[in-house]
UniProtKB/Swiss-Prot annotation:
NCBIfam families: serS. The keyword Cytoplasm applies. The keyword Aminoacyl-tRNA synthetase applies. PROSITE patterns: AA_TRNA_LIGASE_II. Pfam families: Seryl_tRNA_N (PF02403), tRNA-synt_2b (PF00587). Its main location: cytoplasm. Catalyzes the attachment of serine to tRNA(Ser). Is also able to aminoacylate tRNA(Sec) with serine, to form the misacylated tRNA L-seryl-tRNA(Sec), which will be further converted into selenocysteinyl-tRNA(Sec). This is Serine--tRNA ligase 2. HAMAP family: Ser_tRNA_synth_type1.
Length: 425
């Protein structure tokens, strides 16, 4: 959440910056009008409370002097009733201000490309050369089905569209990938966490999914809980309403979890394969840092994700997303996109974002600076990586003409020495 005081003091700047993210200037004006009304109500209430205290003193004095205080008592009762009315109105307006502020996205960093179009993203670097095939490469879903390691038909039978079974070496490959990821992150100083897969509305609010994207979530209505769309939610909320000791910063967390996505608005897109599912595994990285360190930590976070693709030998590039394409909470996002030969293009496999103090302000996560003053931490998150998409990229990039798939060298130990996936019996 943005600081309402900051918006009040810099309205034109905020309108310009959030305008780059598609926010109408009238939304800022409406927020400021409500904020002004709230402040007026507070001032009136405080003035009446001062009057009430003064009259209370007069009543006490008259009673000590055994004088008639009925007029003052009547006045104090009226003032108290007015204070109650004003405070109730203030609470209503305050809720309106908070709701308006909760729907505003984070301010973009000055280096973020200004555009509402995703195709205007800026490429930072390109690593690896796409493999030249002596045969026509197949799509990963065809490879997986031909080998008997991915079963989309039975997944749809049991759960509906955008679900599948990993079978045999398919399940082993998925497990090999995420264990490799977790081991690499642990070596980089991340603490592994096994988080809850269902969270409260307050947790979803803290990381910015609620209230704006509530319709996109899978809800457990009987318990008023939500299936997590990413492990970012429980990891960031680990420190909700807490003060992190400054000497502990930065804190690095990593977690494997399923991600549950409604994928509203994706009808007709990526209807086959592992790219867009309602349930998929993902290894997440989350950082809590001091504000002055967060931009360096974003580069480290991105490098952590990149190192996985390098070790897997998968061609990829890194892009900086535009102001209109970043996630709601991000001030800057670097996307890693891996090469898919059958599609002849790069597809997203990781998003690494600096959310500055946006989530920390919503979730009340703070630390004490050198002067002992409470400050909000900065939070960062990144996929490290999306497991299913990594499996898909391996199947396509390491496929052989005979239909088998060579296992990347770094995964062979995780596959108990197996170097190739062949058709299942």
């Amino acid at each position: 959440m943005l600081d309402v005081k900051m918006i009040r003091q810099n309205p034109d700047f905020v309108k310009e910056q959030l305008g780059h993210r598609g926010v109408a200037a009238s939304d800022i004006d409406d927020l400021l009008a409500a904020d002004e009304k709230r402040r007026e109500l507070i001032a009136k209430s405080e003035q009446l409370k001062s009057t009430r205290n003064q009259v209370s003193g007069e009543i006490s004095q008259k009673k000590r002097n055994k004088e008639d205080a009925s007029a003052e008592i009547a006045e104090m009762q009226k003032v108290s009733a007015d204070v109650k009315t004003l405070d109730e109105e203030r609470r209503t307006v305050d809720a309106q201000v908070q709701d308006m502020a909760a729907h505003l996205p984070n301010m973009p960093h000055p280096d973020v490309p200004v555009s509402l179009k995703e195709e205007d993203a800026v490429e930072l670097r390109r690593i690896g050369t796409p493999r030249h095939f002596d045969f026509t490469p197949k799509a990963h879903w065809d490879i997986g089905e031909d080998l008997g390691i991915l079963d989309f038909e039975r997944g749809a039978k049991v759960s509906g569209s955008r679900f599948l079974y990993y079978v045999g070496d398919g399940a082993k490959l998925e497990r090999a990938v995420y264990n490799f990821f977790l081991d690499q992150h642990e070596a980089e100083g991340y603490t592994e966490v096994l988080p809850p897969y269902m969270v409260t509305d307050e947790s979803m609010y803290g990381t910015g999914q609620f209230p704006k994207f509530k319709e996109d979530a899978f809800r457990i209505t009987t318990q008023d809980l939500t299936l997590i769309p990413t492990a970012e939610v429980p990891l960031v909320n680990y420190y909700r309403d807490e003060v992190i000791p400054a000497e502990k910063l930065p804190v690095y967390f990593t977690a494997l979890s399923p991600a549950f996505r409604e994928e509203a608005g994706s009808a007709g897109r990526d209807t086959k394969g592992l790219i867009r599912l309602h349930q998929f595994n993902k290894v997440e990285m989350v950082k809590f840092t001091k504000p002055e360190d967060s931009w360096d930590e974003l580069e480290k976070l991105t490098n952590n994700a990149e190192s996985l693709l390098k070790k897997l030998g998968l061609p990829y590039h890194v892009i900086t997303l535009t102001t209109g394409d970043m996630s709601f909470t991000a001030a800057m996002t670097h996307d890693l996109e891996v090469w898919f030969p059958e599609q002849d293009k790069y597809r997203e496999i990781s998003s690494c974002s600096n959310c500055t103090d946006f989530q920390a302000r919503r979730a009340h996560i703070q630390y004490r600076d050198d002067d002992g003053k409470l400050q909000f931490v900065h939070t960062l998150n990144g996929s490290g990586l999306a497991v299913g998409r990594t499996v898909a990229a391996i199947l396509e990039n390491y496929q052989n003409e005979d239909g088998t798939v060579t296992i990347p060298d770094v995964l062979v130990p995780y596959m108990h020495g197996k170097t190739k996936i062949e058709k299942q019996g």
